[in-house]
Protein backbone atom coordinates (compact mmCIF):
# COMPACT_ATOMS: atom_id res chain seq x y z
CA UNK A 1 0.00 0.00 0.00
CA UNK A 2 1.37 3.41 -0.92
CA UNK A 3 0.50 7.06 -0.70
CA UNK A 4 1.79 10.09 -2.54
CA UNK A 5 1.49 13.79 -1.85
CA UNK A 6 0.03 16.32 -4.27
CA UNK A 7 0.99 19.94 -3.76
CA UNK A 8 0.66 23.14 -5.76
CA UNK A 9 2.65 26.23 -6.56
CA UNK A 10 0.04 28.38 -4.81
CA UNK A 11 -3.58 28.38 -3.72
CA UNK A 12 -6.27 28.20 -6.42
CA UNK A 13 -3.97 26.52 -8.96
CA UNK A 14 -6.17 23.45 -9.43
CA UNK A 15 -4.87 20.90 -6.94
CA UNK A 16 -8.28 19.28 -6.50
CA UNK A 17 -8.93 19.28 -10.25
CA UNK A 18 -5.59 17.53 -10.77
CA UNK A 19 -6.39 15.13 -7.93
CA UNK A 20 -9.67 14.22 -9.62
CA UNK A 21 -7.88 13.66 -12.92
CA UNK A 22 -5.27 11.38 -11.35
CA UNK A 23 -7.83 9.40 -9.35
CA UNK A 24 -9.96 8.84 -12.46
CA UNK A 25 -6.94 7.89 -14.59
CA UNK A 26 -5.62 5.35 -12.07
CA UNK A 27 -9.09 3.88 -11.55
CA UNK A 28 -9.24 3.32 -15.31
CA UNK A 29 -6.11 1.19 -14.83
CA UNK A 30 -7.88 -0.90 -12.22
CA UNK A 31 -6.19 0.69 -9.22
CA UNK A 32 -8.16 1.13 -6.01
CA UNK A 33 -7.46 4.73 -4.99
CA UNK A 34 -8.95 7.39 -2.75
CA UNK A 35 -8.08 11.00 -2.09
CA UNK A 36 -7.28 12.32 1.37
CA UNK A 37 -7.30 16.02 2.29
CA UNK A 38 -5.97 16.14 5.86
CA UNK A 39 -6.68 19.83 6.44
CA UNK A 40 -9.29 21.72 4.44
CA UNK A 41 -10.51 25.30 4.52
CA UNK A 42 -13.95 26.42 3.49
CA UNK A 43 -12.36 29.39 1.83
CA UNK A 44 -8.80 29.70 0.54
CA UNK A 45 -9.23 33.10 -1.03
CA UNK A 46 -7.77 36.20 0.59
CA UNK A 47 -10.62 37.54 2.72
CA UNK A 48 -9.98 39.97 5.56
CA UNK A 49 -11.28 38.80 8.91
CA UNK A 50 -10.53 40.13 12.36
CA UNK A 51 -9.63 36.84 14.02
CA UNK A 52 -9.50 38.34 17.50
CA UNK A 53 -13.15 39.36 17.25
CA UNK A 54 -14.46 36.42 15.24
CA UNK A 55 -13.12 33.37 17.07
CA UNK A 56 -16.58 32.12 18.06
CA UNK A 57 -18.05 32.64 14.61
CA UNK A 58 -15.12 30.96 12.88
CA UNK A 59 -14.54 28.05 15.25
CA UNK A 60 -16.46 25.36 13.37
CA UNK A 61 -13.40 23.28 12.55
CA UNK A 62 -15.40 20.05 12.23
CA UNK A 63 -17.76 21.18 9.47
CA UNK A 64 -18.28 18.91 6.46
CA UNK A 65 -18.90 21.28 3.59
CA UNK A 66 -15.51 21.80 1.98
CA UNK A 67 -15.84 21.63 -1.80
CA UNK A 68 -12.40 20.04 -2.26
CA UNK A 69 -13.19 17.16 0.08
CA UNK A 70 -16.60 16.68 -1.54
CA UNK A 71 -14.96 16.55 -4.98
CA UNK A 72 -12.50 13.91 -3.77
CA UNK A 73 -15.45 11.89 -2.45
CA UNK A 74 -17.22 12.08 -5.82
CA UNK A 75 -14.06 11.24 -7.79
CA UNK A 76 -13.38 7.83 -6.28
CA UNK A 77 -15.34 4.63 -6.89
CA UNK A 78 -14.85 3.70 -3.24
CA UNK A 79 -17.55 4.34 -0.66
CA UNK A 80 -15.87 6.81 1.67
CA UNK A 81 -17.29 9.19 4.23
CA UNK A 82 -16.31 12.83 4.62
CA UNK A 83 -14.62 12.08 7.96
CA UNK A 84 -12.67 9.19 6.46
CA UNK A 85 -10.86 11.37 3.92
CA UNK A 86 -10.57 14.59 5.93
CA UNK A 87 -9.13 15.11 9.39
CA UNK A 88 -9.95 18.80 9.84
CA UNK A 89 -12.14 21.32 8.03
CA UNK A 90 -11.96 24.97 9.06
CA UNK A 91 -14.44 27.67 8.13
CA UNK A 92 -11.66 30.25 8.32
CA UNK A 93 -8.34 30.18 6.49
CA UNK A 94 -4.89 29.50 7.93
CA UNK A 95 -5.79 28.20 11.41
CA UNK A 96 -2.13 28.62 12.39
CA UNK A 97 -3.08 32.25 13.09
CA UNK A 98 -6.09 31.40 15.25
CA UNK A 99 -6.91 29.65 18.48
CA UNK A 100 -8.54 26.83 16.51
CA UNK A 101 -5.23 26.01 14.83
CA UNK A 102 -4.06 24.53 18.10
CA UNK A 103 -6.64 21.77 17.65
CA UNK A 104 -4.74 20.27 14.70
CA UNK A 105 -3.04 17.12 15.96
CA UNK A 106 -0.39 15.65 13.70
CA UNK A 107 -1.00 12.30 15.40
CA UNK A 108 -4.59 12.28 14.13
CA UNK A 109 -3.43 13.01 10.58
CA UNK A 110 -0.89 10.19 10.87
CA UNK A 111 -3.51 7.75 12.13
CA UNK A 112 -6.06 8.72 9.48
CA UNK A 113 -3.49 8.26 6.70
CA UNK A 114 -2.37 4.91 8.12
CA UNK A 115 -5.98 3.73 8.19
CA UNK A 116 -6.46 4.64 4.53
CA UNK A 117 -3.15 3.05 3.52
CA UNK A 118 -4.24 -0.20 5.14
CA UNK A 119 -7.60 -0.21 3.39
CA UNK A 120 -6.82 0.97 -0.15
CA UNK A 121 -4.18 0.28 -2.77
CA UNK A 122 -3.21 3.90 -3.14
CA UNK A 123 -3.93 7.17 -1.37
CA UNK A 124 -3.55 10.54 -3.05
CA UNK A 125 -2.87 13.04 -0.27
CA UNK A 126 -3.81 16.57 -1.29
CA UNK A 127 -2.15 19.42 0.56
CA UNK A 128 -3.63 22.86 1.22
CA UNK A 129 -2.33 26.10 -0.25
CA UNK A 130 1.34 25.54 -1.16
CA UNK A 131 4.23 23.25 -0.27
CA UNK A 132 5.60 25.16 2.73
CA UNK A 133 2.26 26.28 4.17
CA UNK A 134 2.32 25.86 7.97
CA UNK A 135 0.03 23.40 9.70
CA UNK A 136 0.87 24.88 13.08
CA UNK A 137 3.51 27.19 14.52
CA UNK A 138 6.32 24.64 14.11
CA UNK A 139 5.28 22.23 11.33
CA UNK A 140 4.38 22.60 7.66
CA UNK A 141 2.88 20.30 5.03
CA UNK A 142 6.34 19.67 3.57
CA UNK A 143 7.57 18.43 6.96
CA UNK A 144 4.61 16.10 7.26
CA UNK A 145 5.09 14.71 3.75
CA UNK A 146 8.75 14.09 4.55
CA UNK A 147 7.88 12.31 7.80
CA UNK A 148 5.97 9.77 5.71
CA UNK A 149 8.55 9.73 2.89
CA UNK A 150 5.81 10.39 0.37
CA UNK A 151 6.79 11.03 -3.24
CA UNK A 152 5.36 14.25 -4.61
CA UNK A 153 3.29 15.42 -7.57
CA UNK A 154 3.41 19.16 -8.27
CA UNK A 155 0.50 21.07 -9.79
CA UNK A 156 1.53 24.22 -11.62
CA UNK A 157 -1.20 26.76 -12.27
CA UNK A 158 -0.07 28.29 -15.55
CA UNK A 159 -0.17 32.04 -14.97
CA UNK A 160 2.17 34.99 -14.73
CA UNK A 161 4.79 34.20 -12.12
CA UNK A 162 4.37 30.43 -12.30
CA UNK A 163 7.92 29.86 -13.54
CA UNK A 164 9.41 31.26 -10.36
CA UNK A 165 6.86 29.57 -8.11
CA UNK A 166 7.30 26.20 -9.81
CA UNK A 167 11.09 26.18 -9.77
CA UNK A 168 11.29 27.33 -6.15
CA UNK A 169 8.83 24.60 -5.12
CA UNK A 170 10.77 21.93 -7.02
CA UNK A 171 13.97 23.09 -5.33
CA UNK A 172 12.35 22.84 -1.90
CA UNK A 173 10.99 19.36 -2.62
CA UNK A 174 14.50 18.27 -3.60
CA UNK A 175 15.94 19.81 -0.44
CA UNK A 176 13.50 17.71 1.59
CA UNK A 177 14.94 14.64 -0.11
CA UNK A 178 11.63 13.51 -1.57
CA UNK A 179 11.23 12.14 -5.09
CA UNK A 180 9.23 14.26 -7.52
CA UNK A 181 7.06 11.86 -9.51
CA UNK A 182 6.16 14.57 -12.00
CA UNK A 183 4.22 17.75 -12.52
CA UNK A 184 0.86 18.71 -13.98
CA UNK A 185 0.15 21.90 -15.89
CA UNK A 186 -3.28 23.35 -15.17
CA UNK A 187 -4.35 26.19 -17.45
CA UNK A 188 -6.12 28.59 -15.09
CA UNK A 189 -5.87 31.67 -17.32
CA UNK A 190 -7.15 31.04 -20.87
CA UNK A 191 -5.98 34.47 -22.00
CA UNK A 192 -2.36 34.04 -20.93
CA UNK A 193 0.05 34.36 -23.83
CA UNK A 194 3.09 32.14 -24.44
CA UNK A 195 1.41 29.10 -22.88
CA UNK A 196 3.33 26.62 -25.04
CA UNK A 197 6.61 28.38 -24.36
CA UNK A 198 5.99 28.24 -20.60
CA UNK A 199 5.32 24.50 -20.78
CA UNK A 200 8.46 23.94 -22.84
CA UNK A 201 10.62 25.92 -20.43
CA UNK A 202 9.23 24.17 -17.36
CA UNK A 203 9.73 20.79 -19.06
CA UNK A 204 13.34 21.72 -19.66
CA UNK A 205 13.96 23.01 -16.14
CA UNK A 206 12.07 20.43 -14.04
CA UNK A 207 13.88 17.12 -13.68
CA UNK A 208 10.67 15.10 -13.66
CA UNK A 209 8.17 14.25 -16.39
CA UNK A 210 5.12 16.26 -17.32
CA UNK A 211 2.23 14.03 -16.24
CA UNK A 212 -0.47 15.95 -18.03
CA UNK A 213 -1.94 19.24 -19.17
CA UNK A 214 -5.42 20.18 -18.03
CA UNK A 215 -7.01 22.86 -20.23
CA UNK A 216 -9.16 25.68 -18.99
CA UNK A 217 -12.55 24.04 -18.37
CA UNK A 218 -15.99 25.03 -17.11
CA UNK A 219 -16.78 23.13 -13.91
CA UNK A 220 -13.90 20.66 -14.24
CA UNK A 221 -14.86 19.08 -10.91
CA UNK A 222 -17.90 17.60 -12.69
CA UNK A 223 -16.05 16.24 -15.72
CA UNK A 224 -14.14 13.13 -16.69
CA UNK A 225 -10.54 14.34 -16.59
CA UNK A 226 -8.65 11.06 -16.90
CA UNK A 227 -7.73 11.67 -20.54
CA UNK A 228 -5.56 14.62 -19.56
CA UNK A 229 -3.16 12.45 -17.51
CA UNK A 230 -0.36 10.43 -19.07
CA UNK A 231 2.95 8.88 -17.94
CA UNK A 232 0.86 6.76 -15.59
CA UNK A 233 3.81 4.45 -14.99
CA UNK A 234 5.24 7.19 -12.77
CA UNK A 235 2.15 6.98 -10.57
CA UNK A 236 1.92 3.19 -10.44
CA UNK A 237 5.14 2.56 -8.54
CA UNK A 238 2.98 1.00 -5.83
CA UNK A 239 1.70 -2.55 -5.76
CA UNK A 240 -1.24 -2.81 -8.14
CA UNK A 241 -2.54 -6.24 -7.21
CA UNK A 242 -5.60 -6.16 -5.01
CA UNK A 243 -5.58 -8.40 -1.98
CA UNK A 244 -7.83 -11.40 -2.29
Swiss-Prot record:
Its main location: cytoplasm. GO terms for molecular function: ATP binding; dethiobiotin synthase activity; magnesium ion binding. It is an enzyme of class 6 (ligase). Its cofactor is Mg(2+). Keywords: ATP-binding, Biotin biosynthesis, Cytoplasm, Ligase, Magnesium, Metal-binding, Nucleotide-binding. Coiled coil: none annotated. Homodimer. This is ATP-dependent dethiobiotin synthetase BioD 1. It comes from Pasteurella multocida (strain Pm70). The gene is bioD1.
